[in-house]
């Protein structure tokens, strides 16, 4: 047996109820309740244990009969004032005894048990009120005592003594009151005499001044001090005093001056002191009182007027009840029993309150009964409380009953379906009912938290607004009283699915300004949850989850296996054509976009599984209904981040349509420029040849004229001599003398002639030498112009040699570089442009030739003064563009003429890149490909302005001055340096290593440029080298990646020596890998104007070489279509002052260098990291300074790069670079991790770099030793911390090398420059890109160089590695969190919090809320829903992510179809071939067909595959586009095989069609119906071709007849020529109209439409409209059939005309009319019919155009009636 304490403990545990959490109430403290129960138990135990002896000696009550005991109990009840209970007890006992078939055998025993149990029940609440004034709601009221049944008196009647004393007190009190009334002054106590209280006591001055004054409402009702000033309550400062300008007096004294008020009494200052009335003598007033003649409740001192009668209720409850009974009795008596009023049932107010609270929860009670058929609560008739009528109570209770009815109906409506049964109403309805249950739970919490001590009116007031909401929700759900009242009409079915969302949205819009709005918003948000999840899955991943078929889309699985347009049109279909049936109203305008978006993603998954949309791990913004301001901002931010990241992925993963078009336009412009250059070269050659021929002809003519002139003179002299001889023959002496003189004269003439001939020979030699020089100069010019042709040849030769080299290297050891020949390149420049400023500069040395590495560099011979002047003169001539003076000098036979290497074809670069990706382990020379530097050529900077004319190669005009201004105090050094040329040039050529060819004109961006410019600018200077320069390595290594850090250049005095590694070969040639020592004092040189290059400008930077240099303002940078290569101002020297770099340019692939890098004096040993080659540009476009004391550089404003920052390479410039380091550089590439926003610990050195994904960009940290000058572009970080960046694709790489560096964060660059939001700064970058944790600085040395990492123990390394793996796994798990689709909405049924609609109730009546419960909605949600309209909220929360993703998907689909699938080329192929835009193809095809047709071949002979295929292949050979890949898609097809070809039928070949094969997925756009339309147009065009062929054949026959039969003069022949001409005009008009409208106008409209298409549906629609327009304008529609019939008839007449012409031969010419044709009358008749039809067609088309139908026919009218032929006739 357990102890007493244990038993009591168990008893208390059993009695305590189970702990239940009741919303709105504090939880019951079980310990306290248990303690109180124990106290009761022990009190009962001890009360029975320790009793007095007197109480123990009681008469033995067990001997009394049980009935007597019951009667004793009933007597106790009557004594206690419970008469009805006593009567009820006696009545029940009598019934029990009188019952004949009582089931209980021992009735007495049962009654005895009940008697023993009497008084042992729980104490009643009201019985504790032992004091009349304790907690009495009537305290303070003057209420007369009621009868026996009044509970308030029954409290006293429990004790007889107290009852008697109370009666005595009452009598005494009544006597005292009567005496006081008789003895008191007149008027005292009058307002309270009797039952009525008038409430208007005017007995004394105190009452008048306080309660009866005008401002009585503004003061307290009682004042205990006569001197208290009554004033207005305090008013806040912000109150509006405009209505208080005039103050009303506080009291108007009626005795002083009744009826008259002066104006001064109403002024505010006159009322500052209230006037007090004097006391009157009451007895005098009573004696002199005269009653007013007016019948009113007028008293002394009261103003006259109507007074209200007092309310009956002021007489007290008892009086009201009696009066009600009296009136009811009167009605009964008057009606004679006709009016059966319900019997009044008096109920305690506490019971009514309890029943009311129960019925609010749907609980039936005695007061409220439930009507089962209508599911409504009904108030029992006659229920009332004391002091109120049944009708008034019934009106209050009926409202409460209505609330309970609505609650009950809503509870039934929102019941969850049975688990396991299918809910046909869908998920949206389930979500709506769960939201409704949540609201009802909140409502229950409000009811349960209401204390039962409130009055009925308070409860009715508190639940008024909640009741209105319940009533509204019942009406909303169709279960309200109004809905059920119209039972005659069929009830509308409650909407489900998207219609329910539209219904809720419309209701929310209609109720946006009342109290139901927040509840509707809550229900709308809950109901939208399943739909937004469906939309989320469909839009983002194309997943279709619709269990109940309630959403917009229906899946046809059989069509999903199709691979044509049926997959697109029938695989996923909308459930209805009405938009409202498919989507909610608020998504109506983007319903189609959402539908197409999911279809597009599924199509991309099917066609291109590797598309970035299918595998992208960028987190998507959520789609949900949001009313919170913070969440809305988060959504908008997430959308912006998502769009930015996806666009970055898109730019990296594929080429966009716009980029492709831009590239094509650039290539087109380049082609145009090259063509123009070629044309100008050919024209100049022609003009030169013509000029040379003209000069030669002129010379020949002059020589011939000179010969004729000499002959004439000689002949004249001979005649004169002959005449003289005749005169002198007579005299012999004279003859002899003449003979002697003649001989002497002949001798003199001979001598003179020899002298003249010698002089002529001398000057002819001089002129021939001059002519030869001129020819040589012209030859040089011509050679220079043919440079590009030579260059192509040499490039191909060089490729062959390089392939031979590779083969030889693979077979035998590498030979010295000098063995292999290689083409050289030259850097040409014009003469010095500052020569006119007074400084002498020998132009003979303005060019350095970097020849073939296999040949020694030939020394440049000195140029005589005349050659120099000639070069200067030629510079001003028309041929001076880009010439060098050495072009006019003779070239040694052994010296190979240098050429300019303009680049490597893009295909070779791509192949090399692919090879480098496929072979990660390769020999050293081929390990790194040229992909990094050369990819910059194929990439285009979309932010630059397209200047194709400037971006291409040489223009014929003279160059403009692009040289930098040179300080005048430095220019005198030019003359000094020119004197050193002869002494140093030979040494320099010996000591300089044999240079390899310059790389093609695009230098490696920025970092490659300084050395390239250095060499180019050195070509204009005399370079003095130190004596020890000859000790350098004879040749430099050739690096395929062409990295700048491969060069070992000595500049100035203070650079340390570098041991050169063994030289290596380079395929493409680097410009700056020679070991060049430059002397101390280098003069400044104004660089020559560099050549333009289509692949990028090569020298836009100001470079200074030397020790003491002054400032240089950099020249304006040039645009480059492949990205700018030199935005950095680079200074080389010892003391270099500041340079402000030019503004960097934008690049679509990201700017590659925003860091200002300084290289200091003392640089220690650095092992360069293995740089990762980059597809999108080089790694260093930076402002780099080399020298001893380098001042600061103000960095340009940094630009963000969508592909990541690429200028973070770990590049160090140091002293001792070992072979191992360069091998590292040759072999592979490592990449340090990328930065998030804060520095992370440094990476471990020995971790292998992970493979970089395609979107990754080479990024490394560029830095120098800590001893170098600090960067000014950011705060200095500690040496132990190094920022690392995490890539945007969740993969990281560990750098193989770290440096002690001071790195500037990009956000801190510059002073006062605002930080731009970059891709690395996004909020969820941490989730996307888990960075590997890194170790400290000491652990980061490479294995080749000793460092502190050797001292770290293995255990610490293992611990660090384990920690890194754990951190990596943790970050990886954050990436992949599974998002489950919830199929149960239990969370929505959890107990809600009362904050949901807390702003609807006044704060004084708000329900108590547990402060520990957090609010369900954030506070800004309520404010936001009040500030913004619902459409705006839905647009910002739902439309923003949807619109963002839909636009991304649509653009991706458009880019995929246009770029990957080349859709536009298919459209062009269809236009070329099926629409016969390619005239060569159409002409040859039609000629071949019609020739065989005209030859009389049968259908079996013509329409067989062999013949048709040969015809098609021949036509394609003639075609301009026959070699395109799409030409293979063409084939002939037969619709049917005719038995014979109908004669004179224009559609004789309608059985033949030209088919175009379209593969999946292009057949979604180019469908079978589209191909049929193409075929119809082709058929009509073939008819036109038949007409043209027919007319050509007619013309041929007429011409042959005219030639053979000589019928040209025949009259009939002339007539037939005119007939043919008119027919030809008609056919050509139709052909021109079709070509213009279909081939040109419709195509241009189609192209314009394609330029702006947004998604795949629009492409499909645009193509269908294009074809429809072509068919419509080609008159091939059914409505245009009458017009087409006329045209067919005309065509038939043309064919008939031909057959009539060729069927018979011409007759002989018998008469004056000439030859005649036998069928001429028939042909004349055919022509007449043709003319009739053509005029009729003209009239029909004119009417169509005038009516406005088919306005495009105006073109046809204009063509056919251009000279008003038809109109006039």
UniProtKB/Swiss-Prot annotation:
Pfam families assigned: GCP6_N, GCP_C_terminal, GCP_N_terminal
Listed InterPro entries: GCP, GCP6_N, GCP_C, GCP_C_sf, GCP_N
Keywords in alphabetical order: Cytoplasm, Cytoskeleton, Microtubule
Region feature Disordered, mapped onto this chain: 809-842, 859-881, 1284-1360
Biased composition (Basic and acidic residues): 1314-1326
Recorded superkingdom: Eukaryota
One cellular component term from this protein's GO annotations in UniProt: gamma-tubulin ring complex
Main location: cytoplasm
A single MF term (Gene Ontology): gamma-tubulin binding
GO BP: microtubule nucleation
Family: Belongs to the TUBGCP family.
Quaternary structure and partners: Component of the gamma-tubulin ring complex (gTuRC) consisting of TUBGCP2, TUBGCP3, TUBGCP4, TUBGCP5 and TUBGCP6 and gamma-tubulin TUBG1 or TUBG2. TUBGCP2, TUBGCP3, TUBGCP4, TUBGCP5 and TUBGCP6 assemble in a 5:5:2:1:1 stoichiometry; each is associated with a gamma-tubulin, thereby arranging 14 gamma-tubulins in a helical manner. Gamma-tubulin at the first position is blocked by TUBGCP3 at the last position, allowing 13 protafilaments to grow into a microtubule.
Protein name: Gamma-tubulin complex component 6
Higher taxonomy: Eukaryota, Metazoa, Chordata, Craniata, Vertebrata
